[in-house]
Amino acid sequence: MELELLFQNVVNSSAFYNNQVAVAVSGGVDSIVLLHLMTNWAKKNKLSLPIALTVNHGLRPESQKEADFVVSYAKELGAKESFILNWEKQNIKGNIQLQARKARYKLLAEWCKNNNVKYLLVAHHKDDQAETFLLRLERGSGVDGLSSMDYKSFLNGIDIFRPLLNFSRSEIEKYAKLHRLKWIEDRSNHDLKYRRTLYRNLLKASDNQEILTERICLTALHMKRAAKALMHYTRLAFNDCVNVHDLGYIEIKLSEFYQLPEEIALRLLLYSIMAIASKHYKPRYSSLIAIFNRILQKDSNVNCTLSGCKIRKYGENILIIRESSRIQEITVNLPLNEPTQWDNRFSCTILGNQGCSVIIAPLKKTQKVPEFLKDYNCCPEVFYSLPTVQKDSKVLAYPDVNYNGKNTNDDKVQCIINSTIKQNLVSLISI
């Protein structure tokens, strides 16, 4: 069949040859077809069979039953193994579908990372792309939001592939019926309270759904090209305007910032905030643009917060500093055999053989800032966003910009830090 041949051409050119692959399976027709295609491809090429992962969001009474169906049917289709990942919901407010989507990807990526599976396949297709475009158009999205989905993306160290992107829902359903596959019809797909259902029905009601869907996807592709061009010039602006400091903050030179086209300057501010906060989701546009417009008023005072960051004017620069109250302390046991990540901004190597439990936490305003830190010519708020090694509220070691721990006289503990903010930036602006 043509779909199967085209699918094989897609995956034959992919990087996951000879590597374990996981497939996200909701139980819907698209993900069942993806699992069937991938299993057949692996068998044909004598490769490791895919692992099926399904997320139980627990949002409907039948959720557990559907998850059990996926596990059972995945085995029947020939999956190597199958697992149910449960979403532990807490205080859900606002857009529940968006929160469920974020939770789903988080659970899938974490499972893959914890089980040394580098490649995750998801079943987005051409109709998904068109519906997403219309949804975002209604919300007033910009170039990035209206851009086509990527065949390959990256999340928390995991490569995510979408091998069905060029296939329509009708082609996928035709394949499923031909092979007599079983799947679940999600009732929410027909629930008119969801905007996606509205746009799905709108496309179906058009004179020629396939042509309209194709043209919407083509427009999304044009937007993707435009987004890549904008990102290219954003990267150049970072080289000229931004200093990523070893002390874990970002400094934007205002003299250069004011010379940039507004779209590039806005992106530079956005990705600086995301890199410090280590978030893959963008902050609310209305909040971002309010801060941006304030920065553009050259005589205005800028001192505000967004996404767990402090954005403030300091001399001739704009500083993006981590908000200390949003930093979570972590507990580690000494000695540590390898570096540990702290606040997604630092890789910390803690040296010491006391065999005790310590915490890595920022300084509190009530704790003394050592003189050697004051010698650095930076905003004092930076000091309270740095990692220190503490026990019983006593500081055992301070970090040093030169990556050598400054120790107190009575404890033999070293805190060697390496900033990971540049890596955060690279992952954000390297499309």
UniProtKB/Swiss-Prot annotation:
Q: Where in the cell is it found?
A: Cytoplasm
The record's listing under CDD domains reads: TilS_N
Catalytic reactions on record: cytidine(34) in tRNA(Ile2) + L-lysine + ATP = lysidine(34) in tRNA(Ile2) + AMP + diphosphate + H(+)
Residues reported in the UniProt entry to bind ATP = 26-31
> What InterPro entries does the entry give?
Rossmann-like_a/b/a_fold, TilS/TtcA_N, tRNA_Ile_lys_synt, tRNA_Ile_lys_synt_N
* Record carries keyword Nucleus: no
Chief location = cytoplasm
Which Pfam family is one of those matched by this entry? ATP_bind_3
EC? Answer: 6.3.4.19
* Family matches, as Gene3D superfamilies: HUPs (3.40.50.620)
This protein's GO cellular component annotations are: cytoplasm
- Write the record's keywords in alphabetical order, separated by commas: ATP-binding, Cytoplasm, Ligase, Nucleotide-binding, tRNA processing
Q: What's a Gene Ontology MF term here?
A: ATP binding
Biological process according to GO:
tRNA modification
Q: What does this protein do?
A: Ligates lysine onto the cytidine present at position 34 of the AUA codon-specific tRNA(Ile) that contains the anticodon CAU, in an ATP-dependent manner. Cytidine is converted to lysidine, thus changing the amino acid specificity of the tRNA from methionine to isoleucine.
Family recorded in the similarity comment: Belongs to the tRNA(Ile)-lysidine synthase family.
> Domain note for this entry?
The N-terminal region contains the highly conserved SGGXDS motif, predicted to be a P-loop motif involved in ATP binding.
What protein name is recorded for this chain?
A: tRNA(Ile)-lysidine synthase
Its source organism is Wolbachia pipientis wMel
